[in-house]
C-alpha cells in the first residue's frame, strides 16, 4: 500500500544501509534525526491507524441489533521516538480517534484518546540489510466522550460501545504497526541494489554487523564495494578496521557519516582501472594562441624545429599507469597524480611521430562537497608540476623551459577533465527520496566526516 511504503521510507531514515566485511564507512543517526522522523511521520501514522471497526452487536433488546461504527478521523498530535541503548528505538504516540456510531434515533460521534507504545529491535538479515521487528507493543485508551451530550443513547449502551471499540483497537492497532514494519523490511531489502558511478561502474552498500545503539545515536558499520564491468574493486586487506570517534563533526546534526581512506582509495583505483583519467590534449592549429604545435616546441627544442620546418599539430597523450593517491590530513585533503605524458607530432603522412615522453607528478588540492545524495569534488594544482624526461627522440630537453609550456597547455585540460569526473560524484549511504541538506565536511587524519541534516522528498 502507498501509505505503508511512505511510512517505511520515513522509518528507513533510521537505517541507512551499506557494507561487506571490513567497514569502510560508518553511518551514525543522531537524536535530531529521530526528531525529524517524528515530525514528518505523523501523517503516515495517522493513515495507518485508520482501521476497520466491525459492527457492534447489541443483545440487550428482544432482538439482536447490529450497530455500524466507522472511524471518521485519526489525529496524531504527538509522535516521539527515542533510542534505547543496546536495544533499538521506542515509539511513543498519542492519537485521538473520532468514531461515528450509526444508532437510532440519530448517529452519535465519539472521541477516544489512545496512547501507543512500541519497541523495535534492529538486526541484520542474511543478505546484509537491516531487519526491523516489533518486540513489544501496547496501547492505553482513555474515556470516550460524546460530541453531542443531548443524544438520547442510553449510558449503558455507550459503555458497551466504548468497550467494543477499545477491544477492537487493542487487537488491530499493534497489528497495523507490525504490518508497517514488515513493509519497511521489504523496502529495506531493495537497498542492496547498485548505484551508478559511471557508464560502466557502480557502488553497492551493505551492512557489516548488527547496529550499535546508544542513548544518543544508532551507528551502522557499513562497507562500500565499487564495481567495474561487474567485477569488484579489491584493495589489499587493511588489518585496522575503521572506527569513527564519538565526538566528531557538528554537534546536533541529524546524520554523521564517516568515510575512511579505504573508500577514497577504491574510488581512485576504479577511475584508474576504467581508464577514465586518461586523456588526449590537442589544440587548434590555426588558433593564434595555440601552443600545441611544432613551432611552439621548436622555440624550446631546436631538433623539433629542424625536423618540422612547417607547423604541425602536437598531441599530448596522458595516461595514468599508477593509481592516484588521496592523502587525508587534518583540514587538508590532497591528490597526487603521476601521469605518463607522451608528446607526439603529426608527420607529413598524417602518422603520429613520438617526440619525447615525460614522467609527471601533479599535486592537487581536493575540495569536497555534497549535493543531495552524492559526494563530489573539485581540484586545483598545488605547487609546481614536476617533470622528468622519460625518453626523447629530439635530443636534449631543458625541463625548466618545457615546464612553462606544460603549465599552459597541460594543467587546465587536466583539471577540466578531472573535475568533470569528480563532479559526477559517488552515491552516499541513503534511501530513496532522502537527501542530505546543509552538509558540513570535516577532514581528519585518514578519514572524512560529513555532518548533515536530512530532507525526505515525498
Swiss-Prot record:
Cystine crosslinks: 137-174
Coiled coil: none
Signal peptide from the UniProt entry: 1-20
Location relative to the cell: Secreted
Residue positions, PTM Phosphothreonine: 52
SMART domains: BPI2
Pfam families, per database record: LBP_BPI_CETP, LBP_BPI_CETP_C
Glycosylated residues (UniProt): 96, 151, 293, 332
GO cellular component, one term: endoplasmic reticulum lumen
Modified residues (Phosphoserine): 60
Keywords, sorted A to Z: Disulfide bond, Glycoprotein, Phosphoprotein, Secreted, Signal
InterPro entries named among the record's database cross-references: Bactericidal_perm-incr_a/b_dom (IPR017943), BPI/LBP (IPR030675), BPI_fold-BPI/LBP (IPR051660), Lipid-bd_serum_glycop_C (IPR001124), Lipid-bd_serum_glycop_N (IPR017942)
Tissue: Highly expressed in tonsils, especially in hypertrophic tonsils. Detected at very low levels in fetal liver.
Gene3D superfamilies noted in UniProt: Bactericidal permeability-increasing protein, domain 1, Bactericidal permeability-increasing protein, domain 2
Family membership: Belongs to the BPI/LBP/Plunc superfamily. BPI/LBP family.
Protein name per Swiss-Prot or TrEMBL: BPI fold-containing family B member 2
Species name: Homo sapiens
Amino acid at each position: 500500500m502507498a501509505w505503508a511504503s511512505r511510512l517505511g521510507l520515513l522509518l528507513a531514515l533510521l537505517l541507512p544501509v551499506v557494507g561487506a566485511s571490513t567497514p569502510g564507512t560508518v553511518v551514525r543517526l543522531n537524536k535530531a534525526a529521530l526528531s525529524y522522523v517524528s515530525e514528518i511521520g505523523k501523517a503516515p501514522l495517522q493513515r495507518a491507524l485508520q482501521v476497520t471497526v466491525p459492527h457492534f452487536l447489541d443483545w440487550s433488546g428482544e432482538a439482536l441489533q447490529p450497530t455500524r461504527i466507522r472511524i471518521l478521523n485519526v489525529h496524531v498530535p504527538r509522535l516521539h521516538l527515542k533510542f534505547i541503548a543496546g536495544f533499538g528505538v521506542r515509539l511513543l504516540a498519542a492519537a485521538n480517534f473520532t468514531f461515528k456510531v450509526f444508532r437510532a434515533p440519530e448517529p452519535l460521534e465519539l472521541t477516544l484518546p489512545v496512547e501507543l507504545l512500541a519497541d523495535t529491535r534492529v538486526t541484520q538479515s542474511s543478505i546484509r540489510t537491516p531487519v526491523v521487528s516489533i518486540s513489544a507493543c501496547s496501547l492505553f485508551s482513555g474515556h470516550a466522550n460524546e460530541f453531542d451530550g443531548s443524544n438520547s443513547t442510553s449510558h449503558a449502551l455507550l459503555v458497551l460501545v466504548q468497550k467494543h471499540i477499545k477491544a477492537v483497537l487493542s487487537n488491530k492497532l499493534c497489528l497495523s504497526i507490525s504490518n508497517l514494519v514488515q513493509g519497511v523490511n521489504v523496502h529495506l531489502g531493495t537497498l542492496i541494489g547498485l548505484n551508478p558511478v559511471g557508464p560502466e561502474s557502480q557502488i553497492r552498500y551493505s551492512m557489516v554487523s548488527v547496529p550499535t545503539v546508544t542513548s544518543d545515536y544508532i551507528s551502522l558499520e557499513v562497507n562500500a564495494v565499487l564495481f567495474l564491468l561487474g567485477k569488484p574493486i579489491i584493495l589489499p586487506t587493511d588489518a585496522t578496521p575503521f572506527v569513527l570517534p564519538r565526538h566528531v563533526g557538528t554537534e546536533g546534526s541529524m546524520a554523521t557519516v564517516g568515510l575512511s581512506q579505504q573508500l577514497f582509495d577504491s574510488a581512485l583505483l576504479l577511475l584508474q582501472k576504467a581508464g577514465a583519467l586518461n586523456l588526449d590534449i590537442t589544440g587548434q592549429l590555426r588558433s593564434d594562441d595555440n601552443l600545441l604545435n611544432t613551432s611552439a616546441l621548436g622555440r624550446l627544442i631546436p631538433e623539433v624545429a629542424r625536423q618540422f620546418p612547417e607547423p604541425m599539430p602536437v598531441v599530448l597523450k596522458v595516461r595514468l599507469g599508477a593509481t592516484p593517491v588521496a592523502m587525508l590530513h587534518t583540514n587538508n585533503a590532497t591528490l597526487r597524480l603521476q601521469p605518463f605524458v607522451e608528446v607526439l607530432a603529426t608527420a607529413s603522412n598524417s602518422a603520429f611521430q613520438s617526440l619525447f615522453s615525460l614522467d609527471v607528478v601533479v599535486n592537487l588540492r581536493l575540495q569536497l562537497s555534497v549535493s543531495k545524495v552524492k559526494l563530489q569534488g573539485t581540484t586545483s594544482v598545488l605547487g609546481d608540476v614536476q617533470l622528468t624526461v622519460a625518453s626523447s627522440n629530439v635530443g636534449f630537453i631543458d625541463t625548466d623551459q618545457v615546464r612553462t609550456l606544460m603549465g599552459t597547455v597541460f594543467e587546465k585540460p587536466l583539471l577540466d577533465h578531472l573535475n568533470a569526473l569528480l563532479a559526477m560524484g559517488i552515491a552516499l549511504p541513503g534511501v530513496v527520496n532522502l537527501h542530505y541538506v546543509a552538509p558540513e565536511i570535516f577532514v581528519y587524519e585518514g578519514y572524512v566526516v560529513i555532518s548533515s541534516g536530512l530532507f525526505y522528498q515525498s
